[in-house]
Amino acid sequence: QANADITLFNGGIPGLLEKSHQDMAWRDLVDYSITAVPIITSGRTSRKLQRSEYESIAKKLKSLRIDVLIMAGGDGSLQFLNTLSEFEINCFGVGMTIDNDVYGSDYTIGFSTACEKIIKEVY
């Protein structure tokens, strides 16, 4: 790792599997915060990961000296983080789903936007 403050994995869980990452400094985030340019892509997988895949991801994160993996998503993403944490990886999940169905949370990012869109369509 090139002394980066942040390492981004494009494509969500598939990006972690493909080991597709980019290093970024905090200063870069300031630049992106004033533009509408996306700096990372999302992704999903519809299949259950094998233990060997979790081991591979954990090994990659440890080799990059990642202190914590932060992931935003729904139930599947949070279940993924829960399992990955069993491989001694510090994980932090941010509930982000229009369903607002993340256990233990009263609110998720995306829910209010979905409600607003529905109200606009109805009225």
List each model region and its residues:
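Short, acidic/small-residue loops that bind anionic groups at enzyme active sites
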Residues: 2-7, 85-108, 117-119
